[in-house]
């Protein structure tokens, strides 16, 4: 149980720091987060 958790954490951390654009799940999450951030910033500017 502990080994599996560590392995998963290490695996996620490895691709994140090594290739922040290679993993599909990470890339998708990052893309959506980035897009949301830009949209929110744009919206805020417009609201002001």
Curated annotation (Swiss-Prot):
Q: Where in the cell is it found?
A: Spore core
Keyword vocabulary terms for this entry: Sporulation
The UniProt entry's GO biological process terms, in alphabetical order, are: asexual sporulation; sporulation resulting in formation of a cellular spore
* Translocase as UniProt keyword: no
Q: What induces it?
A: Expressed only in the forespore compartment of sporulating cells. Expression is sigma G-dependent.
The membrane-spanning stretches of this chain are none
Matching entries from InterPro entries are given as: SASP_SspP
Annotated family? Belongs to the SspP family.
Q: Indicate what this protein is called per its UniProt record.
A: Small, acid-soluble spore protein P
């Amino acid at each position: 149980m502990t080994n599996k958790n560590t392995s998963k954490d290490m695996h996620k951390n490895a691709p994140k720091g090594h290739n922040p654009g290679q993993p599909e799940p990470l890339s998708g999450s990052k893309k959506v987060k980035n897009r949301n951030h830009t949209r929110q910033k744009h919206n805020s500017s417009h609201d002001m």
